[in-house]
Amino acid sequence: MNYVQLYQAVQDYAESTEQLFVDNISTFVRQAEDRIYNTVQIPSLRRNVTGTLSANNKYLSAPSDYLSTYSLAVIDTDGTYEYLLNKDVNFIRQAYPQPTDTGLPRYYALFGSQYTDANELSFLLGPTPDSSYTVEMHYFYYPTSIVQGALSSGIITGGTGYANNLYSNVPLTGGSGSGATANITIAGNTVTSVTFNNKGNFYVAGDVLSASTADLGGIGSSFLFTVTAVENTLGTSWLGDNYDPCLLYGALREAVIFQKGEQDMVQYYEKQFQDAMMQLNRLGTGLERGDAYRDGQARIKVNP
């Protein structure tokens, strides 16, 4: 199931094409994805990256999409992988208290926010690297949503004559997609920043968006946002290709809640979602953790 099919199925099951409902389908889908990804570990949640440590620098920045560590290895000068053991910060500080305690790192700890970006994380290594070793991290992250054509970036034409303020949750108009809203900052009577609340769906690069003057203080003109990139132009994902019932019933549960539907319908779709999740869990934490050689073939007991 791709996003176009999922988008239509949600409308068909919910029997609604009301514009506000349709504009929020991408939100229903993203909420379902978040529930799935935080419940079952599946292959599409893992990513592998390599980087380089800085000699005499005990800190390592985590990838911007990092959620948690699967493994962290330092590659020695002869190509040998040395997998680091996860410890807490106190252990590393106590074991290697001096800046001169250098060598091939053996341990790592999730340290906290980076100095340059409070929203991103960093690791503490012990001992401090004595050379610029290559490091390989296998980690969990949120894969790209199945939502097709969500806004990613663009170029602002600020316009003139607007009332200075921060305008929240402003609907964006125009383009080939729908449903996008943003916080728009106006300074010096011109638009200076656009921060998405809802990235919408079905936009394409080259779309030119704007916003109603009525939503921007009632005065001013000529603000434009030219889309330069969107997310997932094909509207596909591993979940959509392999376990679409999880996405469908998860999104429908959110849709019924949005519609203020009857509690029994919420419970119905929740049950359907949980049944689908049992199948996915069988794969993610069952079949993929073993094989027939090690665990034997699955079979049922037959009475003689």
Which residues make up each language-model segment?
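Conserved, function-critical positions that sit in or immediately flank catalytic
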Residues: 148-231
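Glycine-enriched, solvent-exposed interface loops adjoining structured elements
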Residues: 1-148, 231-304
